[in-house]
Amino acid sequence: MDNYTLLNEFILLGIPQTQGLETLLFVVFLFIYFFTLLGNSLIFTAIISSSTLHTPMYFFLGLLSVFDMLFPSVTCPKMLFYLSVRSPAISYKGCAAQLFFYHLLGSTEGCLYSVMAYDRYVAICHPLRYMLIMKPGVCVSLVIIAWLVGCLHATILTSLTFQLVYCASNQVDYFFCDLPAVLPLACTDSKLARKVGSINVGFLALMLLFSVCVSYVHIGVAILRIRSAEGRQKAFSTCSAHLTAILCAYGPVIIIYLQRTPNPLLGAVVQILNNIVSPMLNSLIYSLRNKEVKRSLRRVFQNITFHGQK
């Protein structure tokens, strides 16, 4: 039996090729993270406080705002900590937790995008039966299924990764614990974990993207059948914000998978776009492109101003 010296912590080396830029990166990421939390918390508050937004569409949008606060919180606080105090160590259990929650929240949010696309399909293609089809019980069931898919996906990846033995080098050449960065440090054979991880991530991403495309093909056909320009504009406007958010979420992932040869710097930039920038953009997209959300946000600000003047 091999005598391994097991690791109890990992060292995160950070974003590749950014040595000497720690202070600048800290300021930039702190700014983005702050506005991500602020923007999404305002949208969530606006949806909760306005009775006119208590519909299936805004129920899912409220959940998306919660995910857009939680998802970057898996990686950003730790990254800000080591950028500010230059302490890149993360415990073995902390690394496992980071990988698990990153994939749990990321895949569940991907499922939520598919659910939201289906919701828009029902609203535009079956408007008279919309509230009958998207009953509260159905909405909750769809969210539970999304959580279960995300939990299964994250459990498979985390268990396969951390059942391996890690010894010798503990330097993770990345800014957080993810499969491609952690698996090369394994002292035992990691081929199965790599293969299952690639298939699992690739299959789930393709299935979710396919489901979104199917919903929007039906939506596109339904919009083209609407005779009035005003009707087409109204139908399209209800989907434009969601479609823009999907492009922001899937765009970086598609870019990274189309690479012929992996580029560590490009991979890190894409992950930052997906994990940190995209959640901030979602709050901007929905607050700028959705009239109902803008109206409700205005009321929230008016209430804050009114109470502040008392």
Curated annotation (Swiss-Prot):
Keywords for this protein: Cell membrane, Disulfide bond, G-protein coupled receptor, Glycoprotein, Membrane, Olfaction, Receptor, Sensory transduction, Transducer, Transmembrane, Transmembrane helix
GO biological process entries: G protein-coupled receptor signaling pathway; sensory perception of smell
Record-level GO cellular component terms: membrane; plasma membrane
Stretches that traverse the bilayer: 24-44, 56-76, 96-116, 137-157, 203-223, 238-258, 265-285
Principal subcellular localization: membrane
Keyword Kinase included in the entry's annotation: no
Extracellular side: 1-23, 77-95, 158-202, 259-264
InterPro entries found in the cross-reference section: GPCR_Rhodpsn, GPCR_Rhodpsn_7TM, Olfact_rcpt
Xref: SUPFAM superfamilies: Family A G protein-coupled receptor-like
Topological domain ranges for the Cytoplasmic compartment: 45-55, 117-136, 224-237, 286-310
Cell compartment(s), UniProt: Cell membrane
Membrane topology per record: Multi-pass membrane protein
Annotated glycosylation sites: N3
Pfam families: 7tm_4
Keyword Disulfide bond: yes
Disulphides: C95-C187
Record family assignment: Belongs to the G-protein coupled receptor 1 family.
Protein task: Odorant receptor.
Protein name: Olfactory receptor 10N1
Species per Swiss-Prot/TrEMBL record: Mus musculus
